[in-house]
Amino acid sequence: GGKAKALKKIIKYFPEDLTEMVSPFFGGGAIEIHYAQKHKTRVHGYDLFSQLVNFWEMVLLDPERLTEEVAILKSAKPDLTEIWTQAQDTLRNTEVGQDNAFALAALFYGINRSSFSGATLSGGCSGEAYRKRFNTASIERLKNFKAPTLTVECADFEDSLSRHEPDVFVYADPPYLLEKSTRYGDKGSMHKDFDHLRLHEVMTQRNNW
């Protein structure tokens, strides 16, 4: 789940003066964004959830344009819970391209903010979440988002870690070891059959393990 509320407890275990970080399971990015914004740390974020990656890429590319798309979506569909299944299917079945990247990122944001615990494609809709989390204040925060030392790309943990030297600091927040979990990805696709043993093998090859 999200780490925003646990941020202070987590970062006390991080090195001081952290200049570079690799995050192979970016997700919501609370820890990574904190370091990119507050400490100017160079953060290399990766995730296999392609629609999530597209969202972050569009936020970093042009937050004002993305906000405009979100506003259009909210104006056209004032209550996403009424078209929930249709909206999720659109994200599942539409390939991201140059012409639709911002529109899909806006739809991802709307669904994420309107779903139980931000589960997006792995959870149901929540009218309460829609009212409290998909509102003017949240859209304004999106518009003002800045993190120039952050990048987010689509790659699995093995590929992403291989792109960086073994001594670069890694913050790894992998899927929980829950065989029946459906909390992340598309209906739990990021949880199902995740190879924790392979992750262990890859991580132990790095320096200072």
Regions found by a protein language model. Name each.
Residues G1-L7, P63-G185:
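SAM-dependent nucleic-acid methyltransferase catalytic core
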Residues I11, L142, L161, H196-M203:
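Short amphipathic alpha-helical segments and helix-helix/interface helices
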Residues K12, E16-R92, K132:
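SAM cofactor-binding core of SAM-dependent methyltransferases
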Residues D17-M21, T41-R42, A147-T151, M203-W209:
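Short active-site oxyanion
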Residues P24-F25, Y46-D47, E153-A155, A172-P175, ...:
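Short His-Asn-centered micro-motif
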Residues W56, Y109, W209:
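A residue-level signal for conserved active-site and pocket-lining positions in enzyme catalytic cores
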Residues D167-W209:
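Conserved acidic-Pro-Pro-aromatic motif
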